[in-house]
Each structure stands twice: as structure tokens, then as C-alpha cells.
Amino acid sequence: MRIVNSRYILIIGLVAFLIVGFFSYLLWFLVENSGKVQDEVPEFAGGKTCIGCHPKEYSLWKESDHANAMLIASDSSVKGDFNNAELTFNGKTSRFYKRGNKFYVFTQGEGGIQKEYRIAYTFGIRPLQQYLVPFENGRYQCLPIAWDTRNNKWFNMAAMVYSPSDLQPDNWLYWTNQSQNWNSMCAECHSTNLHKNFDPVAKTYNATWQDINVNCEACHGPGSSHIKWAGLPVDERP
């Protein structure tokens, strides 16, 4: 009996020693490598960092829908006719024009009042291009009138999307209301590493992004670790 008990005690002691040893090593490993793990968390670097190693892919991307998902309104990005073009819908006429290098629309807006709005960004490219208008408190709203890039003409989206098409200013779907708010309804899919930065108390937005459009990292993930890896000599790459 004493021999058997001694064996049990020896086995239990050995198991306890192994368990304590394992967890001691695990604790040491975590403490020793905690800083390294933190340093290796990849960060967004921006789509332009891809050009050096992937010029062909970047060139193809530049012509894609992703690259044109959202851009600053300019002569190169705007496809619509802003040469004093007009569109009449439900008895209301909207006019599109330029002053200098800025794009404007005179249309029915808040409270149903006709007034001038500045176009800040293009939104998409085909089969239609929409336009974003800046408002107070960091808001951007999607203009309901879009440019048909296949037939080269203006059209009001309400004619095809909404019923009734004659939306009133108190309707949630009206273009200056929440339904057409870029910050909360559209932004995350059209820009890369976007942060809305909404202040619920002040009811303001302060949106930030890595790239204004959908860059390589939007699908492939943050690129800093890959860039670091690509910068190593070939025989040193893990």
C-alpha cells in the first residue's frame, strides 16, 4: 500500500509540476511578447503606397468603380452637365452651373424653398453619378437629381425610386432629411477606414477617412505590415 501511495503521490506531484511549469512559461511568453504583438497590429497606409510594387494593378484600379466611389468635385471627376443645364420635375426647375472651378445647383431644398447649393463631392460614376451637398454640423446630403452616364442626361431619382414621387419636405425620404444623409447612410461603403465621429449631444459629424474612395486596403485590409514585409530583403522575409 505504501508503494502504491508513493507512486500516486509521485505521479500527482509530476503532473502538478508540469502544469505549474507550463503556465509559468505561458505567463513569461505573454509578458515578453506583449509589446511585440502590439507593434505588429497593421494600420492603414493609404492606397498610394501600393503603386511602387503594384503599378499595373493600381492603374487598373484608377479606372474602376471603387476608385470613383467618391471624389472631390472637379472638372475631371464631375460627369454631369453644369453648363447652365436645367431639369424640370413636378413643376420645379433645377439649374446646374459653375462659378470658377466650383459646381452649383439651384434647386428645391430645405422647407421646399428654391435656393443655391454647392456640390462638394461626386458619388459613384456609372450607370449614374450622384452629388453630395455640404450642410451645417458636418452633414452631407445626397442630391436627388443624378446624372445618367449612359444617356447623358439629368433625372430625378424620385421618379423611379419613391412613391409618391412628389416628396414633401417633412417626408423622411426627402433629400435634406436623414434618409439621404451621407454620414449615416452611405459613407462606410464609399470610403476607406472611415470614422463618422458623431457627437450625439451636439448632433454633429466630423467624419475622417484614410482615402476618400474605396482603395486596395478596403478589401485587402490595412497594409502597413505588408509594406514592412515587402521592404525586407527577400531572404529575411518570414
Residue ranges and their predicted role:
Residues 17-23, 54:
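Hydrophobic cores of alpha-helical transmembrane segments in multi-pass integral membrane proteins
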Residues 2-17:
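N-terminal Sec-pathway targeting helices
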Residues 99-238:
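Extended surface/linker regions that mediate inter-domain or inter-protein docking
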Residues 66-84:
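Active-site-surrounding "flap" and adjacent substrate/cofactor-binding loops of secreted or lumenal enzymes
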Residues 41-67, 71-72:
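Mature N-terminal segment immediately following signal peptide/propeptide cleavage
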Residues 87:
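Soluble catalytic regions of membrane-associated enzymes that act on cell-envelope
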Residues 28-43:
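Ser/Thr/Pro/Gly-rich low-complexity linker/stalk segments immediately outside membranes or between
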